[in-house]
């Protein structure tokens, strides 16, 4: 077990399988527990950065699709719907603990460009100073390359 007591900043990665059931529907119990633990760490003075996958999986559930899409336009459509749903849920759950969250969607182009990357880093630093939990994800709606690869954890 990691001792978080000596850490000031904690980065947590949550994947689709952590956030959703195989049906694509939200795993409410698990997400509620995670938000409670992260809120407690935040209230103890820790800076929390949340890297969250799950947009496509949430979109599959929200759209009641029978399975995860295989074609890129359908994956992107599911991601567009799912990202809204995912952030709505995070905002709702964290607000119960009076914690504000922010969405930061990244692409390979942003991360590889030094000036754009610096803007993102500056934004994250300012959000943390304001007591906000930044929630980062790759922008699956426009990141074509990412959708054709098996992993979703590049952010």
What are these regions (language model features)?
Residues 11-13, 47-59, 102-103, 135-137:
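Short beta-strand segments at enzyme active-site cores
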Residues 18-20, 55-59, 111-112, 141-143:
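Short, active-site-adjacent cap segments at secondary-structure transitions
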Residues 22-24, 59-64, 114-118, 147:
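Short acidic, glycine/serine/threonine-rich loops at helix termini
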Residues 1-49:
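N-terminal glycine-/serine-/threonine-rich phosphate-binding loop
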């Amino acid at each position: 077990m990691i001792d978080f007591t000596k850490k000031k900043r904690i980065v947590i990665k949550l994947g689709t399988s952590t956030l959703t059931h195989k049906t694509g529907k939200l795993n409410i119990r698990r997400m509620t527990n995670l938000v409670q633990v992260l809120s407690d760490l935040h209230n103890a003075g820790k800076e929390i950065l949340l890297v969250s996958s799950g947009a496509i999986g949430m979109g599959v559930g929200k759209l009641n699709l029978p399975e995860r899409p295989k074609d890129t336009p359908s994956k992107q459509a599911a991601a567009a719907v799912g990202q809204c749903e995912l952030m709505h849920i995070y905002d709702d759950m964290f607000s119960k603990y009076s914690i504000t969250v922010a969405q930061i969607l990244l692409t390979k182009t942003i991360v590889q460009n030094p000036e754009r990357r610096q803007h993102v880093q500056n934004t994250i630093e300012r959000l943390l100073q304001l007591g906000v939990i930044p929630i980062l994800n790759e922008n699956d709606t426009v990141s074509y390359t990412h959708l054709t690869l098996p992993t979703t954890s590049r952010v």
